[in-house]
Amino acid sequence: MITSQTPITVLGAGSYGTALAITFSRNGSPTHLWGHNPAHIAQMQTERQNYRFLPDVIFPEDLHLESNLAQAMEYSQDILIVVPSHAFGEILIKIKPHLKAHHRLIWATKGLERNTGRLLQTVVEEQLGTQYPLAVLSGPTFAKELAQGLPSAITLAANNEQFAREFQSRIHCSKGFRVYINSDMTGVQLGGAIKNVIAIGAGISDGMGFGANARTALITRGIAEITRLGISLGANTNTFMGMSGLGDLVLTCTDNQSRNRRFGLMLGKGLDAQMAMENIGQVVEGFYNTKEAYLLAQRQGVEMPITEQIYQMLFCGKSAQDVAISLLGRACKGE
């Protein structure tokens, strides 16, 4: 029987993986957090906090640290992957020898496969087969606020309704962590990935001093781009008005806790991409997602002007000023 006391294993000890592990443990699920760096895991075990990524948030008693992947997966039926999108394929290769028939896979990674633009669900099914229940967690949740126990809400989409309801009942907490079920895995994955690209655009706009009107226009036209792409892939339009669509987009475009927004701000103020990423010091998912989103839009024949212009800036040397001119100079059209 699945209960809130059933263990969960989280793979990925960065800021977001740690925050989710803290949340699950605090909500009553014995949680095992695995990281690829044994020294980092040992440090967290000693200090009972992730000083590198989430300083001053003390771990609950039922949060266990693990550097042995096989052992970490042995503890739990439910395996939650929280690694950067560029490392997603690699972690699938690592876990494959340790998967058992009873395992169920969830990921909170927001992105598309590097160099192909494929949905992560497609990558999972190709590498691991279609026999496992799969789910994705996505929504407007900054790691620090989540770890601090501040009120948050998130979307859970799964390919198995029973699995979705069981996992929802385990991690949902009425004290401040609300989990909404959505059956549209495609839409939930796309919203989480491409909002990072639009957030870079919002940051660039603010960095150039264009103001709140321009930022709001980018958010609004950004959700239109995401929705068009989603429809071309069979997603439900309503998904993009929910937590994993508009909710995550607004959060990421408007708050400086977002690395993607901060990255864009630096670009708008004249820094190059390499220097901006070095200043942030952590993975900027939107940098990689921009190329993949552009490739995916090209394959699908979907017009995504904001995404295309950010791609031109990051990978083709176009200036922020020329990007702005291109977007503002587009022909008149209906909304």
Swiss-Prot record:
It catalyses: sn-glycerol 3-phosphate + NAD(+) = dihydroxyacetone phosphate + NADH + H(+); sn-glycerol 3-phosphate + NADP(+) = dihydroxyacetone phosphate + NADPH + H(+). GO terms for molecular function: glycerol-3-phosphate dehydrogenase [NAD(P)+] activity; NAD binding. It holds the Pfam family NAD_Gly3P_dh_N. One of its GO terms (biological process) is glycerol-3-phosphate metabolic process. It is an enzyme of class 1 (oxidoreductase). Sn-glycerol 3-phosphate binds at K110, G139, T141, K195, D248, S258, R259, N260. The active site is at K195. It comes from the Bacteria. Pathway: Membrane lipid metabolism; glycerophospholipid metabolism. It is found in: Cytoplasm. Transmembrane segments: none annotated. Its EC number is 1.1.1.94. The keyword Oxidoreductase applies. One of its GO terms (cellular component) is cytosol. NADPH binds at S15, Y16, H36, K110, A143, R259, V283, E285. Keywords: Cytoplasm, Lipid biosynthesis, Lipid metabolism, NAD, NADP, Nucleotide-binding, Oxidoreductase, Phospholipid biosynthesis, Phospholipid metabolism. Catalyzes the reduction of the glycolytic intermediate dihydroxyacetone phosphate (DHAP) to sn-glycerol 3-phosphate (G3P), the key precursor for phospholipid synthesis. Belongs to the NAD-dependent glycerol-3-phosphate dehydrogenase family. This is Glycerol-3-phosphate dehydrogenase [NAD(P)+]. The lineage of its organism: Bacteria, Pseudomonadati, Pseudomonadota, Gammaproteobacteria, Pasteurellales.
